[in-house]
Amino acid sequence: MWIGIISLFPEMFRAITDYGVTGRAVKNGLLSIQSWSPRDFTHDRHRTVDDRPYGGGPGMLMMVQPLRDAIHAAKAAAGEGAKVIYLSPQGRKLDQAGVSELATNQKLILVCGRYEGIDERVIQTEIDEEWSIGDYVLSGGELPAMTLIDSVSRFIPGVLGHEASATEDSFAEGLLDCPHYTRPEVLEGMEVPPVLLSGNHAEIRRWRLKQSLGRTWLRRPKLLENLALTEEQARLLAEFKTEHAQQQHKHDGMA
């Protein structure tokens, strides 16, 4: 996968290119990241990249000409088929389904805004899609872009150590992940669930699915509203609810 970055602070993306899963992907040639700074496309000695908004008001906007020239340079480098994305609070909210959708693109260009944003006409003429990582404001689009790159790169074949890892992540099936345990078997009196030590893969799968359903019901119940549960999933969720109620009753009785 090839990703182009339009940013006033391209050095921030070393966190992606030099470390962790994405760093290994870059090193192994599975992910290629190039960056363009609008500042390199300015024509004044101050390398100005911001301008006042029409109508007044606080703050500045990114200057149109350097930004457009940077986007055009990235498009030229990408060739045909690159999707241009603007990271924006007004965009579609990124979720696992969206990540999976974006991962089908072999070429992405991510435009990172700064100041109060970018000219609406640049969005209309240069941007294919707007994406947001949440209903809050950040100082720029770099962190959302890094979030998008990290999440999308997990779908690139060969990036993860285990091919099933991406499909077993939280939200991959619309559910939160189940609890995980490693050594020691007992930690401050808390034991690993016996089923995970049993070696019975069918029971382990069943336990993990039940816990995933139950955790989603407890913490993010609205996610379940969007799912059509299978007969097995509905049965396991009902079991979890019964067990949870029994545990709560037992806890209340001890209080």
UniProtKB/Swiss-Prot annotation:
Transferase among keywords: yes
BP-aspect Gene Ontology terms: tRNA N1-guanine methylation
Pfam families: tRNA_m1G_MT
Signal peptide as annotated in the record: none
EC number: 2.1.1.228
Keywords assigned: Cytoplasm, Methyltransferase, S-adenosyl-L-methionine, Transferase, tRNA processing
Gene Ontology annotations for the cellular component aspect, listed alphabetically: cytosol
Reaction catalysed by this enzyme: guanosine(37) in tRNA + S-adenosyl-L-methionine = N(1)-methylguanosine(37) in tRNA + S-adenosyl-L-homocysteine + H(+)
Residues where S-adenosyl-L-methionine binds: G113, I133, G134, D135, Y136, V137, L138
InterPro entries xrefs: Alpha/beta_knot_MTases, tRNA_m1G_MeTrfase_C_sf, tRNA_m1G_MeTrfase_TrmD, tRNA_m1G_MTases_N, tRNA_MeTrfase_TRMD/TRM10
Top enzyme class: transferase
Keyword Transferase: yes
GO MF entries: tRNA (guanine(37)-N1)-methyltransferase activity
Subcellular location: Cytoplasm
Subunit comment: Homodimer.
Role description: Specifically methylates guanosine-37 in various tRNAs.
UniProt xrefs under NCBIfam families: PRK00026.1, trmD
Protein name: tRNA (guanine-N(1)-)-methyltransferase
